[in-house]
């Protein structure tokens, strides 16, 4: 973990709620009749939010909240999500809750988020995908991962300077790239931008100084990130929705410039000289190129 002089690698504080909690929650609250019906998703969510989590779980959740001072992601981890031939990744909900001073408020948000993830197993789209893949919905089991969110707070919003998705195989190598080099997709803000197919930067870790999207000015102006996601830092204890992104903000990159979070990751387009310069300068459009990280070695991301 300490192989790099200018970087500390830390694992977010994480807790897993195993599938037995899901089984007990469903059986104790007699939710299967409602969950397997054809009622709207909103009514399913409402029924799940009104149900009670196992009492033995609450003390553990309180202990987790005592040591986490960051927002928390509440992620699905079902038996079918990692199926080799018919993966369910991306089908179920992932909620994020902000950090607020009141532990009682955070506990209420955390409990509701867990219930929301459970409810998402039985939403209309989940059932349709289950049918299309010839799986049986009442055999699905849901674990839940609670994980500290990395990032920084800027006023009433929270987001990381860098988020990314790494792939071990590069299916479309360009130039000197090799398939075994893998690829990384980088973005400013929360990783939802990448997962949802938004504009991000595709990089080969073996060749961080050769990025197709920034190889020419016209391409960079057209193909680099223009908006990013941040978590709204206000309590949502009475406002959970079927849409798990209901408390996320989609903001223009200019907002990040005002936050001061673009240092080392942005370049500036000079419309007078018609050039792109690495770094932040007055005037001109800011482009998310990760130049300081990829080309200047400010942070050894490609090595990590």
Where in the sequence are the language-model features?
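A conserved helix-loop-beta module that forms one wall/lid of the active-site cleft
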Residues: 1-55, 290-298
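Conserved mixed alpha/beta core segments that line enzyme active sites in large multi-domain catalysts
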Residues: 1-3, 52-304
């Amino acid at each position: 973990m300490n192989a790099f002089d200018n970087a500390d690698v830390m694992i977010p504080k994480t807790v897993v709620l195993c599938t037995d909690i899901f089984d007990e929650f469903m059986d104790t609250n007699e939710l299967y009749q409602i969950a397997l019906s054809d009622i709207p998703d909103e009514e399913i969510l409402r029924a799940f939010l009104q149900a009670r989590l196992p009492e033995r779980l609450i003390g553990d959740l309180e202990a987790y909240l005592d040591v986490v001072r960051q927002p928390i992601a509440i992620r699905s981890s079902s038996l079918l999500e990692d199926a080799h031939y018919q993966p369910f990744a991306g089908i179920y909900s992932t909620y994020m809750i902000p950090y607020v001073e009141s532990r009682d408020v955070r506990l209420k948000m955390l409990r509701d988020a867990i219930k929301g993830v459970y409810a998402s197993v039985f939403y209309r789209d989940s059932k349709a995908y289950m049918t299309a893949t010839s799986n049986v919905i009442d055999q699905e089991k849901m674990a839940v991962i609670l994980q500290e969110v990395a990032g920084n707070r800027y006023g009433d919003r929270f987001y990381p300077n860098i988020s990314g998705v790494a792939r071990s195989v590069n299916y479309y190598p360009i130039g000197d790239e090799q398939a075994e080099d893998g690829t990384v997709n980088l973005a400013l803000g929360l990783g939802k931008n990448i997962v949802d197919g938004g504009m991000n930067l595709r990089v080969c870790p073996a060749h961080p100084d050769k990025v197709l999207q920034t190889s020419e000015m016209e391409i960079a102006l057209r193909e680099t990130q223009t908006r990013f996601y941040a978590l709204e830092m206000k309590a949502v204890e009475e406002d959970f929705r079927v849409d798990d992104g209901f408390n996320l903000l989609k903001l223009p990159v200019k907002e990040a410039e005002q936050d001061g979070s673009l240092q080392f990751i942005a370049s500036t387009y000079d419309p007078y000289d018609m050039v792109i310069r690495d770094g932040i300068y007055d005037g001109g459009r800011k482009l998310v190129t990760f130049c300081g990280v990829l080309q200047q070695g400010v942070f050894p991301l490609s090595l990590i």
